């Protein structure tokens, strides 16, 4: 990394980025923060008839690139300026492909970018606790791209996995078509082990609910792709995390395999509220911890609709509480039709509870909950829930 926070792209990674773009005959290509022009040179090898535009903060380097590469027009400017995209004298919405390896640096005075973010449909970026140079470059690229134009941008691992950047991930999946994410090897850039990724995104609203994740070797060879639901990628977007979780699931016993029985409650919340029977519903998860005790006995006529000591109750439907669980330590209770009662052999109770509460378990439940407003976990999916701490022998 140089004094300006730049990691220069090596030729293999440049070729990898260019080869994964889908546009066949672009007319205009943009490279903000062109650096040593590695990305542009790789692009020219594929599309020599296109017109090339770039920015470069260092005057000497900007002049040197234009002299060396006659096909590219380089503007000497600081791309971190909120109005940088206006200085290029390129019509907004006219670029077919944007390629970018932005610098990585924290940006002060984030309020000055409010107008830029709003202009590209990303006003929620203003709610981020901090802004990095990558996000500013991202927004400038979007402003200059035409509708359905492509952006291939190299970003840091923080943007891909950091909790403080969840709003960034949520926004790009909501507003645009994130088609593919490639995780790069840790030592791909000289003099650093910084982990980086390439995001391939189109400036159009996506109808896809999933995204492709791949991993690259130092030679630029790609792994088998894995398909991950977009709503899951809001939490994190790195290939290695999801690849590891898939392997864990393959090796683990399922709820059905350990003899688990799942039953849905019979009575609605309205019916139970109008009765004089103590009951358990989705609203009660907020009031209780992981384990719960019930003191009242349930009448014999309701015993077929009750959960008892050792059972696990799960919210099967809802927006914020779907997948929440509690273990009954004592007593019995009638449960509503929004709840699953899960009964397993005693030896598996604690392992199952820990699996539900683990990061892997929460990720799994989030992936398999479906629906637009109110989300639902189906019984058939839940039967295949993997016990992450229990391997197949």
Description of each model-found segment:
Residues 17-20, 29-43, 78-79, 92-115, ...:
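Conserved proline-anchored active-site loop of SAM-dependent methyltransferases
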């Amino acid at each position: 990394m140089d004094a300006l926070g730049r990691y220069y792209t090596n030729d293999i990674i440049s070729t990898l980025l260019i080869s994964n773009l889908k546009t066949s005959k672009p007319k205009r290509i943009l490279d903000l923060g062109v650096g040593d022009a590695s990305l542009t040179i790789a692009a020219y090898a594929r599309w020599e008839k296109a017109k090339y535009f770039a920015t470069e903060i260092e005057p000497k380097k900007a002049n040197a690139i234009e002299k060396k590469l006659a096909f590219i027009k380089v503007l000497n400017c600081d791309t971190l300026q909120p109005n940088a995209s206006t200085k290029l004298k390129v019509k907004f919405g006219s670029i077919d492909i944007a390629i970018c390896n932005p610098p990585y640096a924290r940006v002060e005075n984030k309020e000055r970018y409010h107008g830029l973010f709003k202009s590209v449909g990303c006003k929620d970026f203003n709610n981020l606790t901090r802004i990095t140079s990558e996000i500013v470059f991202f927004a400038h690229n979007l402003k200059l791209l035409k509708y359905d134009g492509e952006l291939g941008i190299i970003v840091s691992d923080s943007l891909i996995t950091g909790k403080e950047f969840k709003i960034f991930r949520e926004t790009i999946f909501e507003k645009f078509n994130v088609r593919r994410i490639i995780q790069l090897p840790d030592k791909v850039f000289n003099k650093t082990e910084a982990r980086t990724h390439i995001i391939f995104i189109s400036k159009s609203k996506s109808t896809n609910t999933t995204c492709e994740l791949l991993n690259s070797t130092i030679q630029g060879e790609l792994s088998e792709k894995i398909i991950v639901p977009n709503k899951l990628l809001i939490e994190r977007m790195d290939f290695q995390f999801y690849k590891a979780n898939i392997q864990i699931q393959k090796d683990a016993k399922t709820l059905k395999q350990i003899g688990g029985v799942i039953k849905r409650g019979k009575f609605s919340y309205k019916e139970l509220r109008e009765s004089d029977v103590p009951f358990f519903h989705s609203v009660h998860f907020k009031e209780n911890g992981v384990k719960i005790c019930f003191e009242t006995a349930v009448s014999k006529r309701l015993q077929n609709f009750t959960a008892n000591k050792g059972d696990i109750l799960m919210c099967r439907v809802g927006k914020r509480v779907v997948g929440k669980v509690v273990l009954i330590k004592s007593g019995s209770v009638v449960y509503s039709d929004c709840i699953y009662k899960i009964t397993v052999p005693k030896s598996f109770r604690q392992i199952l509870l820990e699996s539900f509460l683990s990061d892997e378990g929460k990720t799994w439940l989030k992936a398999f909950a479906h629906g637009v407003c109110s989300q639902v976990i189906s019984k058939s999916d839940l039967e295949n829930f993997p016990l992450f701490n229990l391997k197949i022998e």
